[in-house]
């Protein structure tokens, strides 16, 4: 085991603070509408330009092991805020730095670190409760667009496209962000349920100009097995021929004689039919077939629950207004399932999401829920160059997370105003001793730090701006975008409550641990041994006599 170096007390804290400051100073220049860019060097390709706090934090690794520990702990603050709310990473970093700097000053002055931490924790608990009271519901499209705009660094086009997407697919709907081909941002909305399985045979195509299949008011047969014997399908096909309606078959697979017969019947116009494979694999396929059944008001024909395909009737089939099938996708539009059943299925999937610990499973469950609840929207980000594309895509993703957080827990006045107002409300919090009282003061001071940093980045004197805002009431704050004071909600400067709350909680949690650090242990860097020199050439052998 390599030898370790141990630092104690003030020596340890000074090193840790140096690391905290290096990381926080690099991150905090990005805060606010007039925040600056940070350029990140990449080992291949062009450098990345970003205004995203967590992207900057993730790049930082320091040479000094003790300084690096401080930097990594603040990086954890940014990552946690990003995971919880998807935004607020820079705010969290600024809060953490302020608490650590003031806290370590107090420790150096001889105060008890544990009492300081207790004071900070009490202040944060009280602040979170007040934030929730201050919070307002965010339900209308205008408010959603404003939140998205603020999070995307005052880019109105991003805020509006996200608001439109949410309006189209609902609040539970899936909105994904992709790199587009054009210069402008584009929004593509897929209504109804879409899954990534296309037609099993091109001979089913009835719209040659688009290479797709369109079925109007079709019956939908859902089967959880392979169909290879046409005899199993005959009763259903005979019943269908009488109604004259088209049929979509969704099964594990349709092959051999069964597929050939369906193709021939379709081409002769006897029965209008199309077949696709069921989406997903294993248990997920069973669940997705059940989703389609609930959406279309049908029944999944599965032998494990005692239903045989030969005995299926038209009552077992689902229906929809329209089905569109391409080479890669199947979209079921306006299924005729009962609304109450769809709602309870969505609630069931939501519960599974809460119980799941796997991010992959959660993502798949979220997709299933969205497909049932309303649809899927794809925002295609447009830009002139690859560097701009990466930067813009990161901003769109940030804005999307922020708007989701706003819909979930509501909004508070932006621009750091909410934390300043909350700080004034909890100044008289009860504590047990003077050191705890100072802990509360440290937390209250930190709550001003985001506003001060926004003002500094806008080229203003932070203390003047902070005092002006503190002397105001309610939503009165500083709009750094156009350098004016006024009602933040009226000016459309909103922050999601969840983002502000998460930033404060994670910053206080990790900063509190850093204040109470008394020793640090790190490996002593090994000096790498010099390379061995090449071996000299061997002399030739002398000639033999």
Curated annotation (Swiss-Prot):
This enzyme catalyses: ATP + H2O + a folded polypeptide = ADP + phosphate + an unfolded polypeptide
Q: Which UniProt keywords apply?
A: ATP-binding, Chaperone, Cytoplasm, Isomerase, Nucleotide-binding
Q: Which GO terms describe its biological process?
A: protein refolding
Q: Which GO terms describe its molecular function?
A: ATP binding; ATP-dependent protein folding chaperone; isomerase activity; unfolded protein binding
Primary localisation category: cytoplasm
Reply yes or no: does the keyword Cytoplasm apply.
yes
- What does the entry list as the binding residues for ATP? 30-33, 51, 87-91, 415, 495
Compartments where located = Cytoplasm
InterPro entries attached here? Chaperonin_Cpn60_CS (IPR018370), Cpn60/GroEL (IPR001844), Cpn60/GroEL/TCP-1 (IPR002423), GroEL-like_apical_dom_sf (IPR027409), GROEL-like_equatorial_sf (IPR027413), TCP-1-like_intermed_sf (IPR027410)
Q: Which GO terms describe its cellular component?
A: cytoplasm
Name the domain of life this protein comes from: Bacteria
Provide the E.C. number(s) assigned to this enzyme: 5.6.1.7
The family database entries (CDD domains) matched by this protein are listed as:
GroEL
Q: Which NCBIfam families match?
A: GroEL, PRK00013.1, PRK12849.1, PRK12850.1, PRK12851.1
> Which family, according to UniProt?
Belongs to the chaperonin (HSP60) family.
Subunit structure, per the record? Forms a cylinder of 14 subunits composed of two heptameric rings stacked back-to-back. Interacts with the co-chaperonin GroES.
PANTHER family per UniProt: 60 KDA HEAT SHOCK PROTEIN, MITOCHONDRIAL
* Cited function: Together with its co-chaperonin GroES, plays an essential role in assisting protein folding. The GroEL-GroES system forms a nano-cage that allows encapsulation of the non-native substrate proteins and provides a physical environment optimized to promote and accelerate protein folding.
- List the protein's name: Chaperonin GroEL
Q: Which organism is it from?
A: Shewanella denitrificans (strain OS217 / ATCC BAA-1090 / DSM 15013)
């Amino acid at each position: 085991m390599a030898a370790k170096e141990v630092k104690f007390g003030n020596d340890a804290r000074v090193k840790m603070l140096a690391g905290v400051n290096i990381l926080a100073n690099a991150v905090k220049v990005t805060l606010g509408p007039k925040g600056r860019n940070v350029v990140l060097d990449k080992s291949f390709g062009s450098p990345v330009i970003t205004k995203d706090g967590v992207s900057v934090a993730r790049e930082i690794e320091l040479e000094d092991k003790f300084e690096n520990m401080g930097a990594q702990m603040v990086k954890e603050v940014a990552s946690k805020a990003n995971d919880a709310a998807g935004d607020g990473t820079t705010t969290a970093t600024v809060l953490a730095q302020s608490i650590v700097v003031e806290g370590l000053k107090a420790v150096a002055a001889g105060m008890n670190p544990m009492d300081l931490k207790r004071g900070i924790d009490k202040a944060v608990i009280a602040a979170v409760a007040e934030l929730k009271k201050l919070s307002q519901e965010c339900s209308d499209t205008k408010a959603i667009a404003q939140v998205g705009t603020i999070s995307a660094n005052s880019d109105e086009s991003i805020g509006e496209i996200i608001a439109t997407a949410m309006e189209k697919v609902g609040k539970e709907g899936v909105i994904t962000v992709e790199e587009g081909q054009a210069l402008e941002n584009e929004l593509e909305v897929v209504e109804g349920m879409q899954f990534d399985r296309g037609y099993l045979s091109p001979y089913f195509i009835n719209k040659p100009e688009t290479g797709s299949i369109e079925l109007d008011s079709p019956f939908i047969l859902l089967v959880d097995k392979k169909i290879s014997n046409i005899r199993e399908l005959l009763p259903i096909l005979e019943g269908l021929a009488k109604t004259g309606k088209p049929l979509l078959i969704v099964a594990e697979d349709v092959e051999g004689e069964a597929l050939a017969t369906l193709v021939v019947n379709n081409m002769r116009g006897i029965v209008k039919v199309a077949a696709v494979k069921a989406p997903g694999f294993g248990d997920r396929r069973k669940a997705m077939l059940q989703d389609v059944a609930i959406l279309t008001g049908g029944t999944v024909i599965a032998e494990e629950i005692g239903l045989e395909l030969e005995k299926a009737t038209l009552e077992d089939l689902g229906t929809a207004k329209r089905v569109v099938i391409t080479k890669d996708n199947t979209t079921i539009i306006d299924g005729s399932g009962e609304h109450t059943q769809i709602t309870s299925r969505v609630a069931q999937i939501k519960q599974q999401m809460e119980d799941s610990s796997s991010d992959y499973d959660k993502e798949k469950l979220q997709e299933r829920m969205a497909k049932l609840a309303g649809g899927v929207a794809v925002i295609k980000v447009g830009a002139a160059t690859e560097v701009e594309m990466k930067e813009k895509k990161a901003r769109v993703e940030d804005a999307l997370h922020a708007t989701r957080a706003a819909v979930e827990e509501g909004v508070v006045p932006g621009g750091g105003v909410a934390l300043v107002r909350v700080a004034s409300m909890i100044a008289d919090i009860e504590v047990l001793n003077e050191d705890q009282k100072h802990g509360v003061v440290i937390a209250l001071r930190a709550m001003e730090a985001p506003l001060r940093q926004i003002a500094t980045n806008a080229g203003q004197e932070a203390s003047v701006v902070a005092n002006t805002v503190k002397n105001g009431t309610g939503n009165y704050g500083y709009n750094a975008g156009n350098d004016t004071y006024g009602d933040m909600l009226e000016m459309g400067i909103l922050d999601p409550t969840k983002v502000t709350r998460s930033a404060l909680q994670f910053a206080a949690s990790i900063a509190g641990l850093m204040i109470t650090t008394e020793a640090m242990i790190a490996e002593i860097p090994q000096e790498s041994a010099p390379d061995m020199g090449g071996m000299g050439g061997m002399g030739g052998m002398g000639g033999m006599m």
